[in-house]
Amino acid sequence: MFKTVDEAIHFIESQRTKRSFEDFQKIIERYQIPIDLKNVIHVAGTNGKGSTVTFIKDLLMKQGYHVGTFTSPYIIKHHERISVDGKPISDDDLLRFINQLLPLIQQEHLSMFEIDTLIMLYYFNELDLDYHIIECGIGGLHDKTNVIKSNVAVITNIGYDHQFMLGDTLLEIAHHKVGIVKENVPLFTTEQNKEILSYFKDYCTKHQSTFYPLQVEKQYQYPYHLHFHQKEYVLHLPTYQVSNLTLALNVVDYLCDLNDEDIQAVIDDF
């Protein structure tokens, strides 16, 4: 048992066990970990995951929903990985859950990411939130977050990352990322590579999933402009954020109604 949250975090961050996705799945089943969350948005991709998660979260919160986010890595402190309505898990809750799960963690020698995943699952289940945005750690197909049943899959883009685990070609990497798409779960992406999009389309067809490939407006002059629902929005943001915002807008529009004022407010506050 840990007496302080600093002791607990030091312990969490020192755990580096390597384990297959299948073995982690067996642990989930053996200990009956609560993996059923409602309205799960699963986000994978090489770049832009963090910004896309933030845009989706802010848009949903503008509609009055309570939103949990699971992200990595953290910027300032470990707590940020598990947040509700933009507020990181408290010291007391983090300490409570790590002590509650400590026998399991020590018995199974869980890694840091596995520990955080379990804490997130117990914490979010306790709160009964409206939406949950879950960001993959590495890849998608074998990422430990893929034990969760999602309602929407999101892939920002495909680039060369973690090649020692995901493969040396873009298609091999795409295969891992698109692995978050489950039966009848729609996929949204702003990937523009035609070969990768064709691969995504075939994968979605096999899994009876609707595929939403999104076009991103080319920007040549600052400030940038984005057209959505027959309205133009002015963006005082870096050009790469146009893609992330386009993705977030379409995902949230699929889930609930959006209005112009809320969209502009999120853009202005980012």
Predicted feature residues:
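Short functional linear segments
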Residues: 1-45, 52-54, 58-65, 70
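Conserved active-site and cofactor/substrate-binding residues in soluble primary-metabolism enzymes
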Residues: 22, 51, 89-92, 96, ...
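Short, intrinsically disordered, charge-balanced linker/junction segments flanking boundaries
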Residues: 264-270
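ATP-dependent carboxylate-amine ligase catalytic core
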Residues: 28-29, 33-36, 62-148, 164-166, ...
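ATP-dependent carboxylate-amine ligase
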Residues: 1-5, 148-149, 254
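A short glycine/serine-rich beta->alpha loop
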Residues: 105-109, 233-239
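Aromatic/hydrophobic pocket-lining residues that form π-stacking "cages" and hydrophobic walls in ligand
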Residues: 56, 120, 198-200
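Acidic, Mg2+-coordinating active-site environments of NTP-dependent enzymes
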Residues: 131, 135, 152-232, 241-263
